[in-house]
């Protein structure tokens, strides 16, 4: 059940579980991780925005486009890898031909919302691929930074650089936009966002409300594992100082199987997952089968069914271990 994505060989998140001898059918109610998720969401909320988390990013809003020495440098280096995953998943899902020619617009005609867009890193890249993009962020300073970037791009001579000027940036929440424009987007992206919200289940439901019934949802985050904590907090924040101290809260990390259950309960069926691995020498990221630290997932609309592959969780799967 492996499938190729670009030059990387990727596995559906539960492919070993389905085809191997160690398969164990566990519903969210009987799986311990699902119980943890359930306990997190004990009261209804109208928004999952954590004002403390939003302020963290707003205080550095002026630095969103400092690629090499700024606090968002890791996101800049990660961006091509994230875009590669999104592009290839979209081509397969929407049955489009792959076109790697420079200047091609493989995502042309698709309406995409980038939830938690920050300064517009992903929004701009998706726009260059031809998509009609809405950049959404709850932080006013982040949205203003993205709009300033747009104005600067208008002065560029390179037409490809001007693509970023076509993005529509909005200061709002996923929950509110879902009420205003339900089922309006072919693709919904929430990359490196779910680990900063107050309630992942409510947030996932908001993503479901935004996407069309035949659309795709992309979520990337950090695994709730020892390696996830060591990589994202101990190394990236404290030792290498790649990102500011306090950027992440380990209690908000989500195990890959936990994320699948969160999405499932929101009506989204996980299609595939891929790990994202950072090379300290080349300072570049690549897609891998290792979901132990950073990972990205794609999901489509689907009603929960115990027979679905994403309901078949093997708690002994080595990819879910520390």
Regions found by a protein language model. Give the residues of each.
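N-terminal, positively charged/glycine-rich alpha-helical extensions of SAM-dependent methyltransferases
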Residues: 28-72
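Short, flexible, mixed-charge acidic loops at enzyme active sites
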Residues: 229-238
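Acceptor-substrate binding/catalytic loop of class I
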Residues: 240-258
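Conserved SAM-binding loop
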Residues: 98-229, 259, 297-299
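Conserved S-adenosyl-L-methionine
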Residues: 268-280
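Core SAM-dependent methyltransferase catalytic element
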Residues: 284-320
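Conserved alpha-helix/loop element of class I SAM-dependent methyltransferases that forms part
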Residues: 76-108
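N-terminal mitochondrial targeting presequence
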Residues: 1-45
């Amino acid at each position: 059940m492996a499938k190729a994505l670009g030059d990387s060989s990727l596995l559906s998140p539960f492919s070993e579980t389905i085809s191997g001898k160690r398969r164990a059918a566990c519903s969210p109610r009987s799986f311990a991780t699902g119980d943890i998720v359930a306990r997190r969401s004990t009261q209804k909320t109208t928004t999952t925005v954590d004002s403390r988390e939003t302020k963290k990013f707003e205080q550095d809003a002026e630095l969103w486009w400092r690629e090499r020495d700024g606090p968002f440098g890791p996101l800049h280096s990660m961006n091509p890898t994230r875009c590669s995953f999104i592009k290839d998943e979209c081509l397969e899902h929407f049955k489009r031909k792959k076109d790697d020619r420079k200047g091609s617009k493989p995502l042309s005609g698709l309406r995409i919302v980038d939830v938690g867009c920050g300064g517009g890193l992903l929004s701009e890249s998706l726009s260059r691929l031809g998509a009609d993009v809405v950049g959404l962020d709850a932080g006013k300073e982040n949205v203003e930074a993205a709009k300033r970037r747009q104005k600067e791009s208008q002065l560029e001579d390179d037409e490809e650089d001007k693509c970023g000027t076509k993005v529509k940036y909005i200061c709002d929440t996923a929950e509110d936009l879902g009420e205003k424009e339900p089922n309006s987007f072919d693709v919904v992206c929430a990359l490196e966002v779910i680990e900063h919200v107050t309630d992942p289940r409510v947030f996932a439901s908001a993503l479901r409300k935004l996407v069309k019934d035949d659309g795709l949802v992309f979520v990337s985050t950090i695994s709730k594992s020892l390696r996830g904590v060591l990589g994202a907090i101990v190394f990236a924040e404290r030792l290498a100082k790649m990102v500011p101290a306090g950027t992440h809260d380990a209690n908000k990390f989500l195990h890959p199987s936990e994320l699948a259950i969160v999405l499932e309960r929101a009506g989204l069926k996980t299609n595939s997952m891929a790990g994202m691995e950072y090379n300290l020498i080349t300072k570049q990221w690549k897609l891998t089968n290792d979901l132990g630290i950073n990972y990205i997932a794609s999901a489509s609309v689907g009603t929960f069914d115990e027979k679905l592959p994403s309901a078949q969780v093997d708690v002994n799967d080595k990819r879910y271990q520390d």
